[in-house]
Every structure is written in C-alpha cells, then in structure tokens.
Amino acid sequence: MTTPGTFEIHATDGAARTGCLHTAHGIVRTPIFMPVGTVGSVKAIAPDDLEAIGAEIILGNTYHLYLRPGDELVARRGGLHEFNAWRKPILTDSGGFQVFSLSGLRRIAEEGVEFRSHLDGSKHLFTPEKVVSIQRNLNSDIMMVLDECVPYGADRTYTEKSVGLTTRWAKRCRDAYPKGAAGNLLFGITQGGFFKDLRTRSIGALTDIDFDGFALGGLSVGEPKAEMMDLLYHSAPLLPADKPRYLMGVGTPLDIINGIAAGVDMFDCVLPTRNARNGTLYTSLGKLNIKRREFAEDDGPLDPACSCYTCRTFSRAYLRHLYTAKELLAFRLNSIHNLTYFLDLVRGARAAIAAGRFAEYKRSFEAIYPEEVVA
C-alpha cells in the first residue's frame, strides 16, 4: 500500500491539474468535490447513495461531533468510519469556523478559543492540541489545524495579529501530531483576510511547517465575488505545488471551476445539499426551481443530460409533487441529483485537463452561469 499522504500529479493544463491523494482509507482522485456530512452524515443521503453517485471522500465537522455525540463515544465505536459505515476517506474540519460563526460568546487567547455550545450554552475550550486529539478520536483520514477565520471587513491591524496567532496555533497542531505518527494526515490552513501581502505571509509561514496539504481559508465569507476571485488567483499558486490544495467552503459550480483553473485540488460546500432541500436543482442548462408551477405536468426528466438515479427514474412533475407535499423523499432525490451534478463537474474537469481542453470546459460553465462571471 502506498504511504498515506503521497500526492501524485498526473496531468496539467495551465495551472489546473489532476492527480491522486493516497489516504489510509483509499485513493482520492483530484480535483475532487467533498459532500459535507457535518454531524457524521450527509443530510438525507445514506452511505450506499454516496457510493452509487461516486463520492470518494466526505467531510465531517469537529465542533459538531465533539458536542454531539462526543468524540470519545465515537472512538469507543472504532472511529467515524465504523460509526457511520462510510468506508472511504473522511476529512474533518477543525471546528474553528463554527466556533467563530455559531458561538455567541467566545474569547480568543494565545491558549485557544473559549466558547459556549450552541446546543446548551455549556462552556468549552478548543486549543490546537485539543482539536488534534478530537480528530484523532474520530480517526479521520485528513485532519485540519485550528485557525481563526476573520470576518469580512476586519481591519489590517486585527487581521495581521490573527495571522500570527493562526500560524502559532498551526505549529502547535503539528507538534501535537508529528508527521508520520499514524495514518492520519494533517493540513494547514492559510488565512490573511483580504490583504494580499498578509495572504502571502501566511502561506509562507505555514509552508515552513511540514503539513501534508494546505488549505485556503477565510474566503466566501460575504465578500464580493470579484474580490474573492482576485484573492483566489493570487493565493492558490503560492501554495506548495507538490501538496494537495484545498479551498474551504467554496462554492458554486463556477467557483469550483475557477478554483480548479487556479490550481486547487479539493473543494467542499453545503450548497448542493442545502439547495436540494430548498428545491433548487443544478442542471446542464443552469439552476432550476422545482417548486415552479410550470413543472406540475412536466413528464420529462429533471436533467436529460444526467444519469443519476433521480433523473433516470422520476419526472419533474413527480419531483415537484414530492416537494410541494413536503415528502421527505424529495430531500433524498434532490440531494442525489445535486451531488451527482457537482461530482460530474469535477469528473469532467479531470477528463478535460487530461485532454488539454480545460479552458474550453471552463467556458462551457461560464455560458451556463453568466451572472457569476467576473470580468
């Protein structure tokens, strides 16, 4: 078996690249989209559904799993793979973003971040060492360091101070889990807000720490699309070329295409499943709102170009009926389709890069989502 953490690049087309990342639970082909299973399950989707649509890796969240059911409970059951019956790779976020976004009361210090649970108000402390320990209990294939995700609009003084703290926390995470200690991989998270020089500084500082991969954090936090794209194309090429690059929490189909064009390998976002539960579905012709009356007697498939179970089996009329009747099956069928769309997107990107036609592939998505194109 190839050593976990081995990252091979198979083809390039401009900055876009295809490859594979070896983990303790199998190979992840890149570029890849990771369905989000925040509390250990991808909402409305069973593991066999994920297998059927070709998911290769899913994401879990340290903050949520620590609070409920508890990482030690999961560890006693053999780790998250045994607990949720997903046998392929799992990445766990450190929970830092949730601490800063969900916890109304929190205190940041050199030691870590103190916060109150959004469930019952109980007080907790996340240190770099603690989040590594939690993720070791979960036994995820890829663990993330504790970082501070500064909000959009934070001034330079605060952001510069935060970059220093995030760097020191990252070093403590690496010290708590030395490289090669076990089969779990540890990724660093670069920050820097919306200041290019601070982004460059953060990347340089974390590159000096020997992580198995590197993430771009703190994007898609409310900034204008043009600003996000500017920072993405500035930052991604600065990340080590021989390690996997991960754009956290992004995004729309065209965001992912732009990320791939910038040289990013890994993506996650709640958008496909959240929108599925709200009746917004992605198709080869763009977004479709299944709630619309025009679909009440439409016997055609949701997307004739899609081969997922939903599109092979059910009509738009039936899908609209399920949604308007508030049937739970609507969540599953819509989620199967949207996740298939996102996974087909990265599968298509891999093929386009290998064939040397990624620019053409990118233009095809710009034609589908013209409102998102940044000049």
UniProtKB/Swiss-Prot annotation:
Chain residue ranges for the region called RNA binding: 249-255, 273-277
Coiled coil spans: none
Cofactor(s) this protein cannot do without: Zn(2+)
GO cellular component: cytosol
Chain positions recorded as Zn(2+) binding sites: C306, C308, C311, H337
Residues given in the record as substrate binding sites: D93, S94, G95, G96, F97, D147, Q191, G218
Keywords: Glycosyltransferase, Metal-binding, Queuosine biosynthesis, Transferase, tRNA processing, Zinc
An annotated GO BP: queuosine biosynthetic process
Catalytic activity line of the entry: 7-aminomethyl-7-carbaguanine + guanosine(34) in tRNA = 7-aminomethyl-7-carbaguanosine(34) in tRNA + guanine
Associated pathway: tRNA modification; tRNA-queuosine biosynthesis
Catalytic machinery residues: D93 (proton acceptor), D268 (nucleophile)
Record-stated family: Belongs to the queuine tRNA-ribosyltransferase family.
Protein's UniProt name: Queuine tRNA-ribosyltransferase
